[in-house]
């Protein structure tokens, strides 16, 4: 609930912060708008000034035009007056221009400044907008979180309401039980008064123990402080702690302190519960002793009063006493039951508290880990800062180098500027000289104009006075003067042009000067920026140095504080020792008899308490022994299981080895068969090639025979043609003979000749038919041989592909064989490692058994010591009123020391046993994890084997299918029959004979299994 309230408060605070940021953003927006308005105004002003500049330029141009016009007029009439006006106007306009330029420069600077401000404000606005967006998203998330937390609060309130109801009911029951327990408390208060004295003595012991604990805590804190100091005092490490890391460290320290407080509270609770248990056990023992006494009294009473009573009144008294005793016994039994219930409850509470303590210890461990992580982070941060400082130093050096370079450049530019200034001075001097020459020429012009006026006047006078001849001479002189005037004007024009050129050069030099000034200003600005960067870096360095100095001062202060605290502690210890000495002296001055009695009583009580504690510790130790035995049994079972698994693994390894051997054998057989197949294929190839050669030879011979037959046919055709011509001639002769009436003998001869010719013709025709049939058969055989050749070529290509595939598969098989061998080798190595580990575990088990035996022997020794202590206690109880002079305080102190030593030994033994048990548990867990890992590997190997077997089956099926496919087309004839055989006979021969010398099934039969041979996709045995 408190956490939820705190989160709600933080959420509200974040909302307020978001509102403030919104206001800041609105203010910034308003500022931005005002800046934009200012910039607009500036732009307007710039535009206006630009317009005025343009107007001024137009005015200047007009003035220039006017000046030119005035010049022309001056050349004709009043040159000097207009020139003066022009100069005045020119100077005035130049002043105006300079003023306007200055204004323009100032405005441009303002514009640049405003634009920079705008850019900066725009960047800040963008940053604020991004921050606002982030914060809005964070606010939304927080709002959702708050809603969820409110729902959780409602649920918690409902649960709290239910809990309060249940607690109210429980309270009611508890109040009833309290009312019942009130009576018991009255009886217990009496016994409490007796134990108050004991409590006070135990309190004094507790105070002493608390002082010791504080001392130990101080030493621990000193050691903890010394550890980081020792780490920090290392010369190679320089610690620069950032404030965030220090805050985290402080938070972790706070958490640690809270956890320590919780631990101390839990320890106090445990102590209180133990005290309660001890009290209840003591009460139970007292009640049991009282019962035993009552039983003894009753037995003595029955023994003394065996005879029946004489009177009825005595009987009634006895019965009343008996009833009263029975009631007391019942009440005591009830008390005993209640105390037993109380003991059970206290045990339950003790278990809960121990669980809480364990949780707290876990939290402590986590916090310590966090502390360790924070220390590592601080070291990382320090390393980063060191790197940053080194980087900044390098940057500083670079900037200083740049600064020196820029200074050198500025010096060079200054020199250039000085040169330019000198040139400007020279140009100005030249200008002055030109202006002086112009003035001289103007004076000469004025003189010439005066002379012309005088000449005009003299001319008029001469016209009036002299004759025409004088006028002509004067006119010639006037023309000469006019020519000289024109030459002077031309010279003036040339001088004007020179002036304009010099002015342009002056303007160019002025512009170059301005550019140089601007560049110098830029360089100076860059230098200033670099100086500022250097200053910032130096300030950062100074800050870092200051921080480091502050940290060192804090360290020194902490060390001084630690030294002061240690000195105060030592003084306090001295004072304590002095006080203890004074106490001992004062106690010695007291009555020795009373002391001895008190000490004896106290020692008996302490011994009883210690005896009870020892019994409890022995019970705990016995329980722990039982647990250890159970763990040992589990270990043995696990060892048995691991041995069984080892055996199974060994069997599997042997099986794998056998399978590997089988695979090797199978691979060798497969290789041998493949070699045989290869040889068979090569033999088949040679036979096929020889068969092809023979068929080619036959084909060539048949082609030759066909050519011969064609030649014979051509000859026979020629002979037939000759015979036909002869027949025709004979028929004509017959006709002629008939016509000429030839004799019968000639006719008969002719008939015989014609019959012979016909016989020859029929024979030739028969031969032709035979030749045509032979050619047809030869053509058929040729086609068959060509088809067979194509088939053979296809088969050869297929065989070559198959050979390639077989070679590839062979390589793959060899690779897989190597892999399997490597796997077997690795598995052997793993087996060896496992066997070594098993041997180690067996040794550890034996050592654990030895440790257990040693612990059992220690337990027996402790039990014997306990028995001796009990005997001594019983002896002390039997002689409680022995004279005090016999027991000296030294003996009592020795007795106390022995008891303390025994207790310390028992506690140390219990701690050692706990540590050993934890170590054993960790080892067992590690062994279980390793066994699980091995089983996983075994399952993986089994899956791989199954997969390989499936692939082998697939391969086998594919090989058998391809055998069946490849078996049908392999039946063919070895050699061709002779040429005169018919095709039907040839086919019969092919079917009957088959291919001799070549096995009909080229692929070997693979009936056995291919174990461990993987099947690559695409590979086949066809």
Curated annotation (Swiss-Prot):
Q: Which residues form the signal peptide?
A: none
Which keywords, in A-to-Z order, does the entry hold? Cell projection, Cilium, Coiled coil, Flagellum
Q: Which GO terms describe its biological process?
A: gene expression; protein localization; protein-containing complex assembly; regulation of protein localization; spermatid development; spermatogenesis
Region annotated Disordered, chain positions: 545-582
Top-level lineage group? Eukaryota
Reply yes or no: does the keyword Aminoacyl-tRNA synthetase apply.
no
**Cell compartment(s), UniProt:** Cell projection, Cilium, Flagellum
* Lipid metabolism recorded as keyword: no
Summarize tissue expression.
Expressed in the testis.
Q: What happens when the gene is disrupted?
A: Knockout male mice are infertile and have acephalic spermatozoa, while females are fertile and show normal follicle development.
Enumerate composition-biased segments (Basic and acidic residues).
545-556, 571-582
Task: Choose one Gene Ontology CC annotation of this protein and give it.
Answer: sperm flagellum
Q: Which InterPro entries does the protein's record reference?
A: PMF1-bd (IPR037391)
What does the record list as coiled-coil region(s)?
89-121, 169-281, 312-377, 411-732, 758-968
Function per UniProt: Required for normal spermatogenesis. It functions as a scaffold protein that attaches the sperm head-tail connecting piece to the nuclear envelope, thus maintaining sperm head and tail integrity. May also be involved in the general organization of cellular cytoskeleton.
Protein name, as recorded = Polyamine-modulated factor 1-binding protein 1
């Amino acid at each position: 609930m408190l956490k939820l309230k705190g989160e709600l408060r933080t959420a509200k605070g974040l909302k307020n912060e978001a509102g403030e940021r919104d206001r800041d953003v609105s203010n910034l927006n308003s500022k931005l708008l005002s800046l934009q308005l200012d910039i607009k105004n500036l732009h307007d002003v710039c535009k206006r000034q630009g317009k005025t500049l343009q107007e001024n330029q137009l005015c200047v141009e007009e003035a220039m035009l006017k000046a030119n016009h005035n010049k022309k007029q001056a050349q004709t009439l009043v040159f000097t007056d207009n020139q003066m006006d022009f100069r005045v106007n020119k100077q005035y306009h130049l002043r105006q221009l300079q003023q306007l330029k200055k204004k323009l420069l100032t405005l441009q600077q303002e514009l640049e400044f405003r634009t920079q401000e705008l850019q900066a404000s725009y960047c800040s606005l963008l940053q604020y907008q991004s921050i606002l967006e982030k914060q809005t998203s964070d606010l939304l998330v927080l709002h959702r979180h708050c809603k969820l937390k409110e729902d959780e609060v409602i649920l918690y309130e409902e649960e709290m309401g239910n809990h309060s109801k249940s607690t109210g009911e429980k309270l009611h029951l508890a109040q009833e039980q309290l009312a019942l327990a009130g009576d018991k408390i009255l009886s217990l208060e009496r016994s409490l008064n007796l134990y108050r004295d004991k409590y006070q003595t135990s309190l004094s012991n507790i105070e002493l123990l608390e002082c010791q604990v504080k001392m130990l805590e101080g030493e621990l804190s000193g050691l903890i402080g010394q550890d980081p100091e020792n780490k920090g005092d290392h010369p190679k490490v320089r610690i620069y702690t950032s404030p965030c890391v220090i805050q985290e460290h402080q938070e972790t320290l706070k958490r640690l302190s809270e956890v320590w407080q919780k631990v101390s509270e839990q320890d106090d609770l445990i102590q209180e519960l133990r005290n309660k248990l001890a009290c209840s056990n003591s009460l139970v023992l007292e009640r049991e002793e009282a019962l035993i006494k009552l039983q003894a009294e009753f037995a003595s009473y029955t023994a003394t009063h065996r005879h029946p009573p004489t009177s009825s009144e005595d009987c009634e008294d006895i019965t009343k006493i008996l009833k009263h005793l029975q009631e007391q016994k019942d009440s005591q039994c009830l008390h005993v039951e209640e105390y037993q219930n109380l003991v059970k409850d206290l045990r339950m509470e003790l278990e809960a508290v121990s669980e809480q303590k364990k949780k707290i210890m876990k939290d402590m461990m986590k916090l310590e880990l966090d502390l360790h992580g924070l220390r590592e982070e601080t070291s990382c941060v320090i390393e980063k800062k060191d790197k940053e400082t080194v980087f900044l130093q390098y940057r500083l050096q670079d900037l200083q180098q740049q600064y020196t370079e820029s200074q050198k450049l500025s010096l060079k530019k200054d020199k250039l500027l000085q040169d330019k200034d000198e040139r400007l001075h020279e140009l100005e001097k030249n200008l002055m000289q030109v202006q002086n020459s112009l003035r001289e020429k103007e004076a000469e012009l004025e003189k010439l104009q005066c002379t012309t006026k005088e000449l005009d006047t003299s001319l008029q006078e001469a016209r009036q006075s002299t004759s025409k001849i004088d006028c002509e001479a004067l006119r010639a002189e006037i023309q000469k003067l006019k020519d000289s005037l024109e030459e002077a004007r031309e010279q003036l024009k040339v001088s004007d042009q020179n002036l304009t050129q010099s002015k342009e050069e002056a303007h160019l030099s002025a512009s170059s000067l301005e550019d140089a000034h601007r560049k110098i200003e830029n360089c100076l600005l860059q230098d200033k920026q670099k100086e500022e960067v250097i200053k910032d870096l130096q300030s950062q360095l100074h800050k870092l140095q200051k921080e480091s100095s502050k940290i060192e001062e804090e360290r020194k202060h902490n060390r001084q504080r630690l030294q002061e605290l240690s000195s105060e502690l030592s003084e306090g210890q001295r004072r304590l020792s002095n006080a203890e000495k004074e106490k001992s002296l004062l106690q010695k001055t007291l009555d020795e008899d009373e002391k001895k009695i008190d000490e004896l009583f106290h020692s008996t009580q302490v011994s009883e308490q210690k005896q009870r504690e020892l019994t409890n510790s022995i019970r705990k130790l016995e329980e722990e022994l039982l647990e250890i035995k159970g763990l040992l049994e589990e270990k043995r079972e696990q060892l048995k299981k691991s041995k069984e698994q080892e055996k199974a693994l060994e069997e599997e390894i042997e099986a794998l080895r056998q399978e590997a051997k089988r695979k090797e054998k199978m691979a060798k057989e497969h290789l041998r068969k493949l070699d045989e197949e290869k040889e068979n294929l090569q033999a088949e190839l040679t036979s096929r090639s020889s068969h092809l050669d023979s068929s080619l030879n036959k084909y060539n011979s048949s082609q030759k025979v066909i050519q011969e037959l064609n030649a014979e046919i051509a000859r026979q055709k020629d002979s037939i043609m000759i015979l036909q011509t002869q027949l025709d001639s004979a028929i004509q002769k017959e006709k002629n003979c008939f016509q000429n009436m030839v004799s019968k003998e000639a006719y008969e001869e002719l008939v015989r000749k014609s019959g012979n010719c016909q016989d020859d013709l029929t024979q030739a025709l028969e031969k032709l038919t035979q030749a045509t049939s032979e050619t047809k058969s030869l053509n058929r055989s040729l086609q068959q041989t060509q088809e067979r050749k194509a088939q053979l070529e296809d088969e050869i290509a297929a065989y070559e592909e198959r050979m390639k595939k077989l070679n590839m598969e062979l390589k793959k098989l060899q690779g897989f064989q190597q892999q399997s061998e490597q796997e077997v080798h690795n598995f052997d190595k793993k087996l060896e490692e496992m066997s070594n580990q098993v041997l180690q575990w067996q040794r550890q088990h034996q050592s654990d058994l030895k440790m257990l035996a040693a612990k059992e022997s220690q337990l027996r020794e402790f039990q014997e010591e306990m028995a001796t202590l009990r005997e001594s206690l019983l002896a002390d109880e039997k002689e409680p009123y022995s004279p005090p002079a016999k027991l000296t305080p030294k003996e009592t102190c020795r007795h106390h020391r022995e008891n303390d030593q025994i207790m310390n030994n028992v506690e140390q033994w219990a701690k050692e046993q706990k540590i050993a048990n934890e170590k054993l548990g960790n080892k067992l867990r590690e062994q279980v994890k390793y066994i699980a890992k091995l089983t996983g590997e075994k399952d993986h190997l089994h899956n791989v084997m199954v997969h390989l077997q499936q692939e082998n089956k697939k391969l086998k099926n594919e090989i058998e299918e391809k055998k069946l496919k490849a078996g049908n087309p392999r039946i063919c004839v070895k050699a061709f029959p002779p040429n005169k055989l018919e095709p039907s006979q040839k086919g019969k021969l092919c079917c009957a004979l088959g291919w001799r010398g070549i096995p009909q099934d080229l692929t070997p039969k693979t009936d056995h299994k291919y174990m461990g041979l993987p099947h690559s996709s695409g590979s086949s045995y066809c």
